[in-house]
């Protein structure tokens, strides 16, 4: 197997806002808390690639996660079918920069961002030779400062006898406006440059 593998994009959290009410589509586990986005999930497929389908009122979101073969690139495709009022989709990349076999326990991240519209260059913990890039066409990027998701809990790590909690960085979020009674596609690209 390849050596020197790293976790960079841990996950992407989404929420939808309709008529002033926010619905979180993500499900995260902390030691004494589980967020309940799973109640909006209608289906999950994994035959060729992960496909999640969510439904909130009259709005349906299909999320497809793809990776480019032989590259350090992830694409998350969102297909949105809105049969109701205007809405806003928020897409939040949650990142790390650690070896695949370690945990970022009690870690405080140092994030530097270079933002040009919806294109973002991240330098995590001063690894300037290994920048991470995000790009979401039609998304409005909002930078976060010193935003850390603390104590994400991994049940499988605990079952293996390892410490099950770690900190993750939340560098910012994308917001996408969705018109009433509309269909829309949007993509989040994340890629990594550099060699170990």
Residue ranges and their predicted role:
Residues 1-196:
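Terminal accessory carbohydrate-recognition/targeting modules of carbohydrate-active enzymes
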């Amino acid at each position: 197997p390849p050596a020197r593998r790293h976790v960079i994009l841990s996950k992407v959290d989404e929420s939808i806002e309709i008529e002033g009410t926010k619905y979180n589509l993500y499900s995260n586990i902390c030691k004494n808390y589980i967020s309940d986005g799973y109640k909006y999930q209608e289906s999950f497929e994994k035959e060729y690639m992960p496909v999640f389908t969510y439904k909130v009122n009259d709005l349906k979101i299909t999320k497809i996660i793809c990776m480019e073969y032989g590259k350090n690139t992830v694409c998350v495709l969102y297909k949105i079918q809105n049969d109701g009022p205007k809405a806003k989709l928020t897409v939040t990349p949650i990142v790390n920069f650690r070896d695949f076999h370690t945990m970022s326990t009690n870690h405080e991240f140092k994030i530097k961002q270079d933002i040009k519209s919806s294109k973002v260059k991240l330098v995590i913990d001063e690894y300037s030779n290994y920048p991470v890039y995000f790009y979401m066409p039609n998304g409005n990027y909002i930078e976060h400062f010193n935003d850390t998701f603390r104590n994400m809990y991994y049940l499988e790590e605990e079952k293996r006898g390892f410490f099950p909690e770690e900190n993750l960085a939340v560098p910012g979020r994308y917001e996408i406006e969705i018109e009433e009674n509309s269909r829309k596609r949007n993509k989040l690209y994340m890629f990594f440059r550099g060699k170990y």
